[in-house]
Each structure stands twice: as structure tokens, then as C-alpha cells.
UniProtKB/Swiss-Prot annotation:
UniProt similarity note: Belongs to the aspartate/glutamate racemases family.
Organism of derivation: Listeria monocytogenes serovar 1/2a (strain ATCC BAA-679 / EGD-e)
Binding site for substrate: D9, S10, Y41, G42, N73, T74, T184, H185
Protein known as: Glutamate racemase
Catalytic residues (positions): C72 (proton donor/acceptor), C183 (proton donor/acceptor)
Amino acid sequence: MKQAIGFIDSGVGGLTVVREVLKQLPHEQVYYLGDTARCPYGPRDKEEVAKFTWEMTNFLVDRGIKMLVIACNTATAAALYDIREKLDIPVIGVIQPGSRAALKATRNNKIGVLGTLGTVESMAYPTALKGLNRRVEVDSLACPKFVSVVESGEYKSAIAKKVVAESLLPLKSTKIDTVILGCTHYPLLKPIIENFMGDGVAVINSGEETASEVSALLDYHNLLDATDEEIEHRFFTTGSTQIFKDIAKDWLNMPDMTVEHIKLGK
């Protein structure tokens, strides 16, 4: 019987990471939990985010996952190291992979970071980037409206274009040549963000680099699955199963997927 890779996020954003993992590792089985009922995590304090992240983690660990991907930047910043220390399975977040991808892309060492308020205030990206390259200059920008645009399914709409233009205006006057999408919801807005920032700015979706790290870690721990056993992906949400399914079907191209509603916490 296949063991799944577990993915957790505050909502549908982590599906952007799942998509990249399934591209690179098509034999792997995915269990995904989106805490849509309590989304967004960005404005919440670190202790509350850590508590919610542990609740999601325990739910998937109880279902026998072989690895955990914290596919949420805010949750990664709040709880990655604590969870990694206490679990006996491999655990990765999305901040280090995103930072590495940005440093590969930049030509002038001037990098912008778009994130939730929680991620920006944590200074997790500047810390990670400067830990890898001390010469890098980082401009961080909180974009609190982006998550609600994605969660409402409006990420291809005129509303999305307006919100992106208004939110990113401060970055247009900087000399950055690379932007990290420092929230896993934001890649659903990537075409609009790329169009607004222009051809001279590389827009980094940390999902690809995270997927490469997932592959490397599974290989290192001898957990890669190359068998042709039947794959049963499972998707869980604390919010509306229909809204989750509509976005997930569009993003993952899984027309027959089912989504299970669960409750977390009290």
C-alpha cells in the first residue's frame, strides 16, 4: 500500500506546490489539507498560526504520511523548525527553496518578496536570503488582499488585475530584478503579476524548487515510490468543499477529484 506525501496550507495555495510535485513525481500519492475555514493565516499572531499548523500536521500524521510539506509560507515561518524537530518523518517548508530559486535567477542581487503580513513581519525571507548570500538586498511587501482574491476564485478576473496593480505599485520604483511569490496562493496570480512587473523582472514560484527538494529528500530517505500501484490522492478542507474543488480541479487538472470536509480544533 502506498504511503502519501502530506501537504498542509491555510487554504488552496499549497496546491501550487502539489502541482509541481506531481509533475516531477507522478507515482507519488498526495494527501492535502487546506484550512480554508480559518484562512487567511497572514494577519494572525505566530502562536496561533503554530497551533493551527500543528493541528493540520497531526491530522495527516494520523493518516500515515511518509513526509510533510508545509506548503504555506506563514506556517513555515511560524512552525517549521518545531515540527521538524518533533516528527520522525522528513519535513520541509517553502521559504528556503524559494530563496534558493531567487538567488539563481537574480542578476543584480536585488530581490523583492511578496508575502502575507505574517511572513513579511517574520523576516524569514531576508534571513534565508542573506544566509545564502550576504550581498543581497531585499525589499519585502505585504499583499494582504491577494489571498482572498485567490480563495474566492477571482484570480483570473479584472478585480485581480486591479488588486495586483494597486498592491505592487511600490515595487515599480525599486531596482529589483527578481520577485519571490512568498505565499503559495500567489502563483495563481503569476500571469497578472508578471504582466504588471514587466519583462525585466523574474517572478519566482517556489513550488518548482520545493518539488525538487521533496524528490531529493525522498531519495535520500529511500522513500521514493516508483511502483504502479493504484494512486488514491485525498484532499481535505475545513471550508467549502465546492469552492475548494472548483479551484483544485482547474489548477491540478483533476476533473474527478473528491474533497472531504473536516473539522479541526475545538
